[in-house]
Amino acid sequence: MKKYDVVALGELLIDFTENGKSNQGNPLFEANPGGAPCNVLAMLTKLGHKTAFIGKVGEDFFGEQLRDAITEVGIDASGLCTDKEIHTTLAMVHTYPDGDRDFSFYRNPGADMMLNKEEICEELIKETKIFHFGTLSMTHEGVREATKEAIRIAEESGATISFDPNLRPPLWNSLDEAKEQVLYGLGHCQILKISDNEIQWLTGEEDYTAGVNWIRERYQIPLILVSMGKEGSRAYYNGSIVEVKPFLQKNTIETTGAGDTFCGCVLHYICEHGMEDLKEENLKDMLTFANAAASVITTRKGALRVMPTREEIQNLLIERAAE
């Protein structure tokens, strides 16, 4: 038996999210712990799974805050390294009236980029059922090598590999370089979670199914999930395509972490049920639960510390079924 259900590698940072205005009319920002891979793990931990994180923060106030935050929510932080020279990565999140957002990163460099392959905790990866990663840990040479080394260990250990590109164009030297690394990820995963705009950017196809077919012609990925924001989500598995509508909320504040919450719930379903012989009914159940969880997180500031409980997700499902 492996010790962990899911181990993730990547960025752990502070998301400064707008939280009203001061008496002088200046914007107030709240320092929320964030970073896609840890958001995914936080959702999984909330649902009772054993998780661990591999990454790097600075030896500074924010780095300590982040280590405390992930430990507090139950993520094993033994693979989290500290950089004495480089500060913890920061992101300013600008939220639009509809809850969508834009990011400005303070990462030139940031501690998350400084992880090297010698710092990878092999034991964590060898002891996990699922290994999850994104592309923020592939933007620069050193951390890219660390990510590829972690993928190699995961493959050798027989872990299922999950990939969410989580494209952030400002962090790349060029979008061609970003595409090259996304394609590397596609070549090494069995579960792909990709957003609607990412699939259009990557494949040049406006139609999501045509985009998935483009990917499938090149890579053998058993389970592909497309998150479509206000349109819901789709799962592509073998010959099946299942689409589930979203659970739209009147009181949406921001969408930060919604895709990560969705991804965490998908991995939860795979941890519970495996990936063999999933029927359309299974895929529908998986997407419905994941959409509901993502919907709940849009009503909250931040993500990592405030992931919904199983009960909150079930209550929303019951409430909507009664409407």
Sequence positions of predicted segments:
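Conserved phosphate-binding/catalytic region of the ribokinase-like
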Residues: 1-5, 152, 206-323
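Short, electropositive alpha-helical surface patch
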Residues: 62-75, 180-187, 213-216, 248
